[in-house]
């Protein structure tokens, strides 16, 4: 098993979730966390990189939210790596992802990333109804930690 699989399985057990990553690194594990987002565990075999992705569940993603996310891509540092936002064109949906080399990956990355993903999903829900400030006006480290 890769570092990624071992760490992901340990993390899932720690939050009382039973879905486990299999030995097949080609697959992805998608966990619907709440109505706003899903967490995706994936692995890029070509670069031996672990991919932690937050997917926003509404399709298409609200344009105000997309604009904020894309304008602020690469501005959030989580667990020593950039949280990069992007757009899946086929579904007009946004995502955020962190890519970490498998050789560096351990369960502490997941423990640091998961709460940030939860906060991003809460912010996302607030922006959709006009209740959240724009990301650009915030102190990012304080906003997400």
What kind of feature is each model-predicted range?
Residues 48-49, 60-61, 103-106:
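A short local loop/turn or secondary-structure capping micro-motif enriched for an aromatic residue
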Residues 39-58:
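A short acidic-to-branched-hydrophobic micro-motif
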Residues 1-39, 79-82, 86:
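Charge-rich, low-complexity N-terminal segments
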Residues 129-145:
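Short, highly charged C-terminal tails/helix-capping segments
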Residues 94-98:
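Short, aliphatic-rich beta-strand segments
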Residues 54-93:
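Short, internal acidic amphipathic alpha-helical interface segments
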Residues 68-78, 99-132:
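Ampiphathic alpha-helical segments that act as solvent-exposed interaction surfaces
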């Amino acid at each position: 098993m890769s570092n990624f699989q071992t760490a992901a399985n340990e993390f899932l057990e720690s939050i009382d979730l039973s879905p486990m990553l299999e030995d097949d690194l080609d697959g992805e594990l998608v966990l619907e966390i709440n109505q706003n987002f899903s967490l995706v565990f994936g692995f890029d075999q070509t670069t031996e990189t672990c991919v932690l992705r937050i997917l926003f569940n509404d399709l298409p993603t609200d344009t105000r939210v997309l604009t904020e996310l894309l304008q602020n891509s690469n501005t959030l540092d989580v667990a020593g790596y950039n949280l990069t936002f992007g757009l899946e064109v086929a579904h007009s949906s946004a995502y955020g992802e962190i890519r970490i080399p498998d050789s560096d990956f351990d369960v502490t990355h997941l423990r640091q990333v998961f709460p940030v993903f939860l906060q991003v999903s809460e912010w996302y829900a607030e922006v959709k109804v006009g209740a959240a400030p724009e990301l650009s006006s915030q102190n990012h480290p304080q906003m997400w930690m």
